[in-house]
Amino acid sequence: MEKLTRILAVANGIEDGALVLRKSVALARRFGAHIELLLFGLADDLEAATLCAVLAYDKVTVASMHPGVESTTDVILRRVFAAQPDLVVKSPAGEHPLKRWTLDDNDWRLANECPAPVLLVRHAPWASPIRFAAAVDVADDETSDTARSILHAAGFMALGCHGNLDILYSEREQHDDALRMERAEKLAQLVREFQVGCERIQVFDGAPEHVLPPVVSARHYDVLVLGAQSHQPALKNLLGATNSRLVQATEGDVVLVKAAGRAEGNGVHDESLREKRSYESEQFA
């Protein structure tokens, strides 16, 4: 994450739009970013314009979306590849009466295929200063690449928001001291690479999927930064289990970040280059 000049905010109706736009504007003010609001559902354009006026932020474009036969995720991805935002903001798609958070397959798919970080927001307001946490793993090359992207995004956002950042790492290796030291040095090197003066490394012992969720739950972070699920089957199961438990543990918002240069998809990127915009009518607020 090198910059934050364009935010793509996605909402399903006016009520959801109020939540998503409020937090998008809170970030945009800090970075001077432009917001494009994709408004799905039977939304009233006048209500959307009024909402933008109430927030008193004039760098907002409102687009009423009518996806037709396409899935909402396909429409979002098509717009992402066309507009190339630096951040996508939306509320989580999944719901469960017994869980704080539930991300459905569409959320995970969006995070895996979207080249920009995806911020999933809930109703809880942010503290001042904002409390960020980044959960990382440096067990091998792929998880280290993801950790680098996580620290880059988390450090950039924390610095721009004048927030606090905790870096959470749990070492699952309990016997090989040389391997433990190698990973500790790798983590320290990554932190130095993205040093912004406000982060704290916190190292725990044990399997991260068991150790870190209680830590996250007890500390009430405003924003938790995680890696999107891996495309390699073995790591996908491992990272998916850890991330799912961390997502369920937090009361705050979640940023899902993909390793730099990793792209997954089903052709939506190529289709976006054909300027297929018949499903969209744009207005300015």
Residue ranges of each PLM-predicted region?
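Residue-level recognition of beta-strand->loop/alpha-helix junctions
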Residues: L39, H66, Y169, Q202-V203, ...
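Short, charged/polar "capping" segments at the starts of alpha-helices
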Residues: G17, A43-A49, E142-S144, H175-E182, ...
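Flexible loop residues that form catalytic
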Residues: N12, A43, A93, D137, ...
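Short acidic/Ser/Thr-enriched loop-to-helix initiation segments
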Residues: M1-E36, T102, N112-C114, P125-L168, ...
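Glycine-rich phosphate/pyrophosphate-binding loop and the adjoining helix
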Residues: N164-P208, P213-P214
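A glycine-rich helix N-cap at a beta->alpha junction
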Residues: Y57-M65
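Gly/Ser-rich helix-loop-strand patches that form or flank binding pockets
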Residues: K3, D74-S128, P214-R277
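Charged docking surfaces used in two-component/phosphorelay signaling
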Residues: M65-V75, F204-E209
